[in-house]
């Protein structure tokens, strides 16, 4: 049975197995299952800065060059609760809706909390301008290394580079998903995501993500913000793979849309309009998150 309560300035949702907490702006501050951390945390057990699910439009690849010179990247947003946490005694579920504002995009997340530790995140993106990607980013705790996914694979693929990739179920590790380009760039997208399982064998914990709607994902142990530059500055920054530091946490993107690659690395064709991120309208996917031992 779900119990919701206010602890100081935080709202807590808990039952005998799991706990989630949010601050008064709607940002997640804690998420545990059977006492085990799901997201990357500080030494005191609170979710680390940038680890909670948040809007994330960060990406940089050589093909983008001047095409995205004026399209900035953000990995955080301002949020507020627009529908307070409410429990439905008949179903035993609780709901809450959070609204976020980021550069060129407003979004809402309608949370549904179930008694069995399942959490639905019905997320609607309402862009007002150009972005490099429309989606959520988060950082999973150290140890979520083993990956099984039902999407296009086994190699990375993008909205304009996916017809040669099979839709199927694949297994790998986060480390094995690295693509060492000459210069660090955004990598590892997998389109048409249906289900993603991340396993932490040391803790005996698995997080399952099921998707209703359009989505893609990528996973990495490297902090993408270290090579994000606007415009065509990518090659002006003398960064190599050996300059990067592998982090213990897992940096995850679950996107509704990521801009296609195009062919502009050598002054070729830019991304076709149908593969650019939408700049208007409402675009929704639902993520169903379920931790299991």
Positions of the model-derived regions?
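Beta-strand/loop-rich accessory regions of lumenal/periplasmic or secreted enzymes
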Residues: 9-10, 14-293
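Positively charged, low-complexity/disordered segments
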Residues: 1-8
